[in-house]
């Protein structure tokens, strides 16, 4: 009988411990996700080169969230949570320090350095350390962790940043249409370079489309579709190249202290050209599916 009572007491204690550890982990997870969510907003601003006045309020909000979370996590004073609380507290503190000092200073720079990518890498490492500790705690106490929408968003951000960084690392200057045009035309006037790029793409796309239409009228629909696909990829490539060049010239090159607003307007007009081309292509594809294309031109 005594052994049975001891067993029941042990089971009850284990159940209470499991409930307590699960509840505490959920609390820590909620507090971490609050900081992660606002940090994701900050990263969006950093990677799209938002102005300082738009990102600073987010930094201040992040600091306010952290102060409340710090007090909430500090209430967990059981021995089981000691390591979890220490790791989470230390890493959240570093996140706030890097954001409130280094990042805020960087936002005031003109032109800005490449610290934005460094900052994102630091955030990924610090949140990764927190996640590793939380997973270890969950494993130790047999708690099931579920990935929230906030965590999914943050992970997707990190994947996107890694992808773009890898893409830029593998790109040479000769791959840039603007860089090529600059060497051929011999001018550094960005308005002229963007205009030349637009005309080049426009001429090339017209050439490709005329070939594609000719194949369609001759009944070679497979080749027609292949040309249409190539045309879409051409527009996407040119659009991406233009955006990358604009961003690089505006923020990364030290010799450009400022970029005239006319340059930005020129780039926007060029991008709107690509948008219109895509809309026209969508209409043509709809007519192609419905077998309602215009008649072949008379020879």
What positions do the PLM features span?
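N-terminal, post-signal-peptide region of Sec/Tat-exported proteins
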Residues: 41-78, 190-204
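Short amphipathic alpha-helical coiled-coil/interface segments
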Residues: 59-66, 88-92, 96, 123, ...
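Residues marking helix boundaries in flexible regions
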Residues: 9-12, 202, 209
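Short, solvent-exposed, charged loop/turn and helix-capping segments
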Residues: 67-91, 101-114, 205-229, 243-247
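Bacterial Sec-dependent N-terminal signal peptides
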Residues: 1-25
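Intrinsically disordered, low-complexity segments enriched in Ser/Pro/Gly/Ala and basic residues
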Residues: 11-13, 21, 28, 38-39, ...
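C-terminal amphipathic alpha-helix
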Residues: 20-56, 102-193, 237-299
